[in-house]
Amino acid sequence: MAAGGITDARGARAVHALGAEGVFAGSVFISAIESRVPDSVKAKIVAANGLDLRLFRTLPDYYRALPGKLSDTLVAMDRAGASRTELAQAMGGLRGMRLGMLEGNTDEGYISVGAGIGNIHAITSVAEVVNQLAV
């Protein structure tokens, strides 16, 4: 399995050539028509590119998020040396992700996406996404 920035057949072929037997493509499915995230979140994903992402370190891992009040606060805390535990508490656990991803509230939540969002140019169906990923 390969993951990270895979949004089309070119990326899928590249990791396949390196030995991967499958891909985990997250962000491209989040922006699909059938996804339950609000259209406002899908539009933000389509409009964004990799340079828009906010990167911060917390438990259990690094997060990439679209700009918003909470994600900007988390980046500032991370840069100021806050502990991973402090950052995890400020994120609000899964509540922060739910508010951002499922309600589009980026004041109290965050929209977590991957580095491949720059290759997502439209809101398409899951069938189209699968066809785009076909090796």
Task: List each model region and its residues.
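Conserved active-site-proximal phosphate/metal-binding subdomains
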Residues: M1, I6-V135
